[in-house]
Amino acid sequence: AASDVYKRQDLKIVRIMPNTPALVKESMSAVMPNEFISKEELDEVLVILNSFGKTEVVSEKLIDGVIAVSGSSPAYVFMMIEAMGDAAVASGLDRKRAYKFAAQAVLGSAKMVLETGMHPGELKDMVCSPKGTTIEAVKKLEEYGFRSALIKAMEACEKKSKEMSK
C-alpha cells in the first residue's frame, strides 16, 4: 500500500495532491511530507508548488478528505457552472455570456470566502433579502438536496480514494 512506502526510512517522500486549476495558477495543493524530509527540502518543494497556486501542509491521514474537497472538487464546480449556464440560456442569455456570468460569480464568491474571513453561511445570508429572489432559489436548492448531494458525493469520493490506496 502507498502508506507502507511512505513510512520507509530509506525514502524521502513528499506526497502532493494538486488540482486542475494549476493550469491557471490557482491550484490548491495539499502537501504531505514524510518525517525524513528536512524543513529546507520542504521549503524547496513549496516554492515550486506555490508557483502555480496555494499550498497547505497536512497530515498524510487527511489525504482522502483532501482529495474529496480539493482534488476532485473542480469537477463539481464545473458541473454547477454548467447548470447555471444552462438555466441562464433557458432564460435568454447566449451560452458564452451565461458561462461568463456564472464563472465570475463563482470566482468572486470564492474570493469573498477567502478574503473576508466570514463564514460561508453568513455570506449567503447577506445575499438573501426577506421574500426576495435569492431566498426563493436557496429554498429550491435545499428542497432538491443541493448541500446533501455535495456532502454525499464527497463522502463517495473519499471512500473510493481509501479503496484505491489499498
Predicted regions and their residues:
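Short, small-residue-biased leader/transition segments that mark boundaries at the very start
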Residues: 1-6
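Short beta-strand segments
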Residues: 15-17, 32, 128
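Internal alpha-helical scaffold of NAD(P)-dependent oxidoreductase catalytic cores
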Residues: 8-12, 28-65, 78-115, 160
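Short pre-catalytic strand/loop immediately N-terminal to key active-site residues, enriched for Gly-Thr
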Residues: 13-14, 63-68, 120-125
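A generic short alpha-helical patch detector that favors 3-5-residue windows
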Residues: 72-76, 100-101, 126-129
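Short, charge-patterned binding micro-sites
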Residues: 21-23
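NAD(P)-dependent Rossmann-like dehydrogenase/reductase catalytic/cofactor-binding core
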Residues: 103-166
